[in-house]
Amino acid sequence: RGVIEMIDIENAKRVFKEYVKNYNPNDGKIALKISHILRVTQKSRELAEELNLNEEDTNLAELIGLLHDIGRFEQVRIYNTFYDKDSINHGEYGVKILFEDGLIRKFIKDDSYDEIIKKAILNHNRPRIEEGLSKRELMHAKIIRDADKLDIYYVLTIEKLENSYGCKDMSKDEITDEIY
């Protein structure tokens, strides 16, 4: 093999931004998914940095974060739901779109990361990560699984509280010694 091309994460983000233009941003499900993906992308980078991974694996973790739910957009367009059991497995569908339909090459030219990306996306929404992965494949599968779950937790708890009760505004209140 020749020299491995570095992952251009900024280009991948531009491609993602173009890709999601194919879907209605005023659809609440689409808007929710875009914001979720962007948070997971950032969280994947943060987890990789916490693990002291090299730049290549940190960028790869971030790229996987960006791609992990790519199947969700067509899932919503076709089935109008995020429930895999009522439609399709979005991890498997994302891998189909990326690799069978060739979309992955718009995000990254080099194919040397394909197996890691594929296995991470396939496993991110499974109850258990499949056995037989290489150490590096397993690491990236765990990073995306954890980043995804952390954001789901955030959306279901913190964001819901902030939206429902205005907790974000309450946190700006001055703390005093006065007793109510």
Question: Predicted regions span which residues?
Answer:
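Short, Lys/Arg-enriched N-terminal segments with co-localized hydrophobic residues
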Residues: 1-5
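Short coil/turn segments at secondary-structure boundaries
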Residues: 81-89, 105-109
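His-Asp-centered metal-binding catalytic motifs of divalent-metal-dependent phosphohydrolases/nucleases
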Residues: 58-83, 91-94, 116-127
